[in-house]
């Protein structure tokens, strides 16, 4: 049996549809709510069929232990098949769940959600260190090698740093641009609603998703990305338009990093879990890993490019003249075994694309100077992606000792963005870094996601035996910076879509930046006789241009271009053919009910788009030029 135990502010459910194996229930069981409860998500497995009574006994014992720890007398039993791929028969599952309900009811207020029904549910996790626990129950007789009943933690590769993160004591403050540190409770956040949401999100540590954020519908409607049911949760499929947007973002970040002085490298996706150096680093990185077996070796899938780049640094001959030394990799993919309840759309994934740059510095002084430069670099990268300073909140995290020695550095970070920022300070260093920042995007559901980040690492040069030759010919350890100039590429797309959704609510017209728009110009001929001239216009434009040659009304064609967020829509009719000009609807300058239309020449439109996309990478149209030749992906 698998148990996922969530200490909840509340849990509520409502049945929607029964499956072929649904138990018969009374009307009272079709919905339920329990507050201040321990929610036990339960998957009864095939091994439990050998001794159901023993499985009940051991599961009840585990639930009681946790209930005592979190001090609650309310328990919700919730059948949740997704916890296991080796389920028991429905008959045994119902038997065990009812047995657990009966055993617990004498000492607790218990509710049980019905088995075999599709249900809508909402759970609010309290977010303290004991609020999310998993247990794996194996009754006697379940395996030949077992002589007695054993209760164990569910097998999962969890780093020591991640465990420490759950118990680390944080001091939360608001840092204002004037350099003052304020207690969170006493600071008026009313003028800063997004910062207020971010503070609440960070301090509560509640990451569970109650409903899909707006970008999920948008990524599907725009045919960018979708869930892939044939893969693990958090692994997405990208349609041609989505692949184009991803590719452009990847190329842009790599271009910026190489101009900044980074060398692009490529490293393996998997590493040996028992490699002594890597094992130590795993325990200092707050993440859950995918693990696999290969030729009797226990391997893990990388969650960043650190492993490969640091092993490469170890083998290099480096002079002080080479410092600062920068390397970058666009990791397609990095993998993190994020908890299932946190996965949603492009916001939090298990497989993602991360630009990961590392900088070897001569000493802490050089590291601090590089940190300043990379902070500004990250602001510039997001600005050019279309995510501005007012679109995200800044978090700065450090040890108290580092802050006392580097106050000016920290204060200048708040001055640069010219707004209050959230500070997290630790008395003890739990991780490999002494300072880090993130730019956090707060979405329409008040959930935050980190984008750009830079960290000062004081451990890994020693751990990986990385050294350089100083001016005196002696070996020295460098100080290391970790930098992701944009954050995960998928999160950039998520942030752009969420931003557009929020702007729509404000009465604005949503759109992607022109350089990222899959179709930059759509030409809409009014009738078949205008198609030839439409083709002539298309040839004069050096950008991603398509032609809507379908046999539809002009109104429908224009509306569909709007639903696809096409930045420039060109309508071709008799007047345009006679005057050799084009009627252009400019999306960026339009209102929701007031399209901005301008008469111009193809050459003028070409010059306008060239100026808007200057300095950005370009790729050709990802689909057929003529809409009549395109398949539908959704």
Curated annotation (Swiss-Prot):
Transmembrane segments: none annotated. Its EC number is 6.1.1.3. It is found in: Cytoplasm. It comes from the Archaea. InterPro entries: aa-tRNA-synt_IIb (IPR002314), aa-tRNA-synth_II (IPR006195), aa-tRNA-synth_II/BPL/LPL (IPR045864), Anticodon-bd (IPR004154), Anticodon-bd_dom_sf (IPR036621), DTD-like_sf (IPR023509), Thr-tRNA-ligase_IIa (IPR002320), Threonyl-tRNA_syn_edit_dom_arc (IPR015011). GO terms for biological process: threonyl-tRNA aminoacylation. Zn(2+) binds at residues 306, 358, 482. Disulfide bonds: none annotated. The N-terminal domain (approximately residues 1-142) is an archaea-specific tRNA-editing domain that hydrolyzes incorrectly charged L-seryl-tRNA(Thr). Catalysis of tRNA editing is performed by the charged tRNA itself. This is Threonine--tRNA ligase. It comes from Methanosarcina mazei (strain ATCC BAA-159 / DSM 3647 / Goe1 / Go1 / JCM 11833 / OCM 88). The gene is thrS.
